[in-house]
């Protein structure tokens, strides 16, 4: 999945996570299929997919209270076992499928090795687009994201609709 330049250091004292842009080419190619249509107010489009979590920092394993991991151990990225992505179109439909599987995260403290199960990711997107003869545009899409981990599974699903007149109005 390639080595990429590192991110700038950001000090975030707020309640919300700082999101960094994706730089890995595998995840950048075809990513527009997984992005929901933009908002009418001109804001950023919504997405359920944050590819930066894939192969990111692993979950710490359960350990006795007296075991402390170093900052270096806590910040190690998890190795990816593999990932598969396909995007394409058939008629008025565009689709995208993405699956990735992480290896188990291994931590070491005081000469003892601890491990935590890796996470599996799956994302599916189906988008129907209709570009009218008069220049108008309609789109209806479905997006589903799933993560599987021994401690917790998560699911998020969404439907989006986009309509733009030939004059460029919503």
Where are these regions (language model features)?
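Outer-membrane beta-barrel channel domains
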Residues: 1-170
């Amino acid at each position: 999945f390639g080595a990429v330049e590192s991110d700038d250091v950001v000090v975030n004292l707020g309640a919300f996570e700082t999101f960094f842009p994706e730089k890995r080419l595998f995840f950048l190619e075809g990513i527009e299929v997984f992005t929901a249509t933009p908002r009418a107010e001109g804001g950023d489009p919504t997405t359920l997919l944050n590819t930066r979590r894939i192969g990111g920092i692993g979950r710490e394993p359960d350990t006795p209270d007296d075991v402390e991991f170093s900052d270096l151990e806590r910040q190690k990225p998890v190795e990816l076992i593999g990932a598969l992505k396909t995007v394409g179109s058939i008629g008025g439909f565009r689709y995208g499928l993405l699956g990735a599987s992480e290896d188990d995260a291994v931590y070491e403290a005081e000469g003892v090795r601890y491990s935590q199960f890796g996470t599996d990711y799956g994302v599916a997107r189906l988008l129907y687009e209709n570009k009218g003869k008069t220049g108008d545009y309609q789109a209806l899409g479905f997006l589903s994201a799933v993560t599987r981990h021994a401690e917790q599974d998560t699911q998020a699903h969404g439907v989006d609709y986009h309509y733009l007149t030939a004059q460029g109005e919503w």
